Amino acid sequence: MTVPHIPRGPVMADIAAFRLTEEEKQRLLDPAVGGIILFRRNFQNIEQLKTLTAEIKALRTPELIIAVDHEGGRVQRFIEGFTRLPAMSTLGEIWDKDGASAAETAAGQVGRVLATELSACGIDLSFTPVLDLDWGNCPVIGNRSFHHNPEAVAHLALALQKGLAKGGMKSCGKHFPGHGFVEGDSHLVLPEDRRSLSELEAADLAPFHIMSREGMAAVMPAHVVYPQVDTKPAGFSEIWLKQILRRDIGFKGVIFSDDLTMEGACGVGGLKERARISFEAGCDIVLVCNRPDLVDELREDFRIPDNPALAQRWQYMANTLGSAAAQAVMQTADFQEAQAFVAGLASPQDTAGGVKVGEAF
């Protein structure tokens, strides 16, 4: 069977279960789609996951980019057969107790194990690291954050990024310009952060500046309003994305929207309007999760935005190690020692009350 050549479009969709239905195959063959994000509902065991990712990648060329939210702690989509990853705050605790060097070493090992295990299963990308500061205000961020100190967050995220690269993965810093100060969960409400730009620059934006200089591949903006900067949520704001992120910070990588079905995105209009405004604001790729009917709505009469960099940016996010090479790495004593070390950092309470973050069913 001839595999159709379909350039990757600017939409990342999802699927319902462990295998592709015929309807889902047709949806993923649409030129609007360029990638797919997987959730817990798509994982039964490692062999099933490998079969699913191979099936997805066989649909078209260039292959769809396959992503997952696999941060560690409360947000780890795949559990059985994978190393249990610690909450990122565990690395911050090591920073405080044992110093920067020990914490950075641990972060590098976490990144390496995280990426290699996913690479072995055909996954291209995990949406990590979380660059939000832990101000103690935001339960949905909480221990997903490395630390409250911007310097610690930046250094630990950079170490994690280096580990990800060893496992064949790029980094995606989130949630620009910072979700940690607000109380609300943008999956459920539209939070407001009333601080000034100068206050944000002095704290929350610092990790984004540093990571951008150090090769961060992608950024995901927050569905949060910062009314002293713009009345629109950051992910729909040209001020935040084109002016502050691109021009002022100098970020040259990929901008992914956060999920456009989240409550924090719903005040902007219907899905087509949300996508249009996201693209106009500066997003390269939009995520539409948990609502395949809305993906179909978006596909109708969809006009792919003019973005000459899209193909290159998609390709930049592709895995660089490959499944077979990653599986070979996993057989080495050195990697197995890293797995044991990382597993020793995790604790049962890491999963408490939060493993469904971002999942609707």
Curated annotation (Swiss-Prot):
Keywords for this protein: Cell cycle, Cell division, Cell shape, Cell wall biogenesis/degradation, Cytoplasm, Glycosidase, Hydrolase, Peptidoglycan synthesis
Subcellular location: Cytoplasm
Reactions mediated catalytically: Hydrolysis of terminal non-reducing N-acetyl-D-hexosamine residues in N-acetyl-beta-D-hexosaminides
Keyword Zinc-finger (UniProt): no
Uppermost EC category: hydrolase
Active site: 187 (proton donor/acceptor), 258 (nucleophile)
Record-linked Pfam families: Glyco_hydro_3
Record pathway: Cell wall biogenesis; peptidoglycan recycling
Listed SUPFAM superfamilies: (Trans)glycosidases
Domain of life: Bacteria
Site annotation Important for catalytic activity: residues: 185
Matching Gene3D superfamilies: Glycoside hydrolase, family 3, N-terminal domain (3.20.20.300)
One Gene Ontology biological process: carbohydrate metabolic process
GO cellular component: cytoplasm
Family according to the record: Belongs to the glycosyl hydrolase 3 family. NagZ subfamily.
NCBIfam families per UniProt: PRK05337.1
Protein purpose: Plays a role in peptidoglycan recycling by cleaving the terminal beta-1,4-linked N-acetylglucosamine (GlcNAc) from peptide-linked peptidoglycan fragments, giving rise to free GlcNAc, anhydro-N-acetylmuramic acid and anhydro-N-acetylmuramic acid-linked peptides.
Name used for this protein in its record: Beta-hexosaminidase
Organism per entry: Neisseria meningitidis serogroup C / serotype 2a (strain ATCC 700532 / DSM 15464 / FAM18)
Lineage: Bacteria, Pseudomonadati, Pseudomonadota, Betaproteobacteria, Neisseriales
